[in-house]
Amino acid sequence: MESLIKSQHAQQLAGHKNTTGKTPSMEMIPATGLAMSSDESMMLKLIQQTHSPDAREVQVRGLLSLVEDILDRATLDSEDTNASMLPLPTEDKLMQSSMMSVLDSVSYAIDRVACEIAYKSLTGSDSHEITMSVFEHLSSFQWDGKLVLTLAAFALNYGEFWLLVQFYSKNQLAKSLAMLKLVPVQNRVTLESVSQGLNDLIREMKSVTACVVELSELPDRYITPDVPQLSRILSTIPIAVYWTIRSVIACISQINMITAMGHEMMNTQMDLWETSMLANKLKNIHDHLAETLRLCYRHIEKQRSSESLKVLHSLFDTTHIDNMKILTALVHPKPHITPLQDGLTKRKVHLDVLRRKTVLLLISDLNILQDELSIFEQIYTESRRNLVGVDGKSHMPYEVVWVPVVDPIEDFERSPILQKKFEDLRDPMPWYSVDSPKLIERHVVEFMRGRWHFMNKPILVVIDPQGNEASLNALHMIWIWGTEAFPFTRSREEELWRRETFSLNLIVDGIDSVIFNWIKPDNYIFLYGGDDLDWIRRFTMAAKATAKDSNVNLEMAYVGKRNHSHREQIRRISEVIRSENLSHSWAEPALMWFFWTRLESMLYSKIQLGKADDHDDVMQGIKKILSYDKLGGWALLSKGPEIVMIAHGAIERTMSVYDRTWKTHVPTKGYTKAMSDHHHDEVLRETGKPCGHFDFHITARSGRIPEKMNCFECQRPMEKYMSFSCCHDEKLHEDENYNF
């Protein structure tokens, strides 16, 4: 960073003088709020002219620690009991040995500065002159070195003064030395006044020095002149050094005046004003430097994150013999960390437990739906149960790892509520979990958002035993086929679809054994949905009446509504349906969530495979259900597994006019044919056929959205437009919809 400051100041050495006699103007340093007067700008050039550092290095950290220890003990009240309250430094011999090597190279410079300040302050030189003299003496040191050496010279003077004060009453040697140096130890009022007046200033001196040292340690590779905002604000470091050294001189001058005038010395109003002014000045400088540090660290983190991101992309584009390099890069690379928690034993384990296994990374934020976790756990637990060998152990060909994402991670670190929420989610999980969101570094989150399209909603990335990405999101395959989709590749997905037809088996498979057991050749089954309880009552009672009169076996099941914001309303409707015995209805809301999620997953799966054409029965059927659900009530009728009809809310009218219209056609046409003909030929002719209208929720799960899509009713191209909706029920941070 030193090279940056030098290059910045090299452009300023042309210099200019304030010859106008006008009041100095103020220049605002961007992004900091720190104003620099034109006088300070000229002073900056004078300071820079004294700055010609050589190759020597000062171990400023060690020296600063020693200086801070002296000042911390010396700036207490003069009562020696206070000094004894500070903890003694540990490893004293080791510290003394290392400090001796540091001081060997700089002790002469410290003594020289101490003598220069003491002499010139007693001879009446003004503070600015003495400060510039210190800069001349320390011209060969870097900015942090100048400041720490000057502070060490001050600690030498100030520490000796207070050491004599603290031991005056206990040690005859201290008493004699105090008398020889004219320290007014018996004038407690004077000493306490000096201490109170200087403590605030010394505290600010230490704070500014610590910031300057920290800024000087920033790596040059990231803080470069091509970042103008950073280079501009860093160029104010010499001014910070100037005012801190000037404050040192003010403190030493006051101590020297006390020892020179002895018991007659009292702080003047001017002395108090000067220390107060300097303390305020340094506080403003410290605030500016602290903000500068924050900006620099943010810039460095961004640069390092960018570098790490490139490395991570390169790693995924490289062939590996196993998956360990990939998993280590994703879940904290430090070898001493045990980054996983075993869901069964609740013990921390190393990543080695995943070596050469297919790994399913369940990536989500902390707002993952309990319904989603519940269904996923059922699928996971059942698959483990089915794969238990004769040895009693599970032989699953894959492992699941939950990867919790909190972005920004600072929210997690300062929020006990989020930490408790994470633990409540992790602890019941039977699979592996990353032990803390803090183990997922920022560039990894950026990688997941960019490469895997993670958008807070859960995704399931599959890493094969060699570390390759088998699937960027296999969650829709899990919802449709469960673990039968293993190894979750595109070819496996295509193979499974070749075996499927649009049937009731596909729609309800894995959800409810009751409905699945209804699927017999002579059974008629109505699945229906909506949130209008009056419509539901009319439809179910009319449908059951038609079935009874037609002497057919009809079963009915209520499946709720796709929009999860209606969750509580749907729960109450479901309770009424069961209490009034209107039809079968799921008591567990998670099953309704699963039903609609499976339909969406089928739609997205077809789209990703490029099968979103208008001749695909699965696509057409799902589009109808999703579209009719958006309009209100709807129903799907099947005979056995065969789906024979999908209708919107007008199906209730078709049922209610049974006696007056299509009843007479049932003996000749059959129950479904008579109903369907009347519905399409009579009811829809009056009510009209509703064209398609449904939403794609833009998340990583949905993947790409088709450029065009035809209406399933009129076959004309559908209009596409974008909308944004806030979904508090799903606790999403971001949600976009594409409406067709």
Curated annotation (Swiss-Prot):
Q: In which tissues is it expressed?
A: Expressed in phloem sieve elements.
Q: Write out the ranges of the annotated region (Disordered).
A: 1-27
Query: What top-level branch of life does the organism fall under?
Result: Eukaryota
Task: Tell me the Gene Ontology biological-process terms attached to this UniProt entry.
Answer: phloem development
Q: Which InterPro entries match?
A: SEO_C, SEO_N, SEOA
* Polar residues biased stretches: 1-23
Outcome of gene disruption: No visible phenotype under normal growth conditions.
Record-level Gene Ontology MF annotations:
protein homodimerization activity
The record describes the protein's role as: Scaffold protein required to form the phloem filament matrix in sieve elements.
Subunit-structure text: Can form homodimer.
Protein name stated in the entry? Protein SIEVE ELEMENT OCCLUSION B
Q: Give the source species.
A: Arabidopsis thaliana
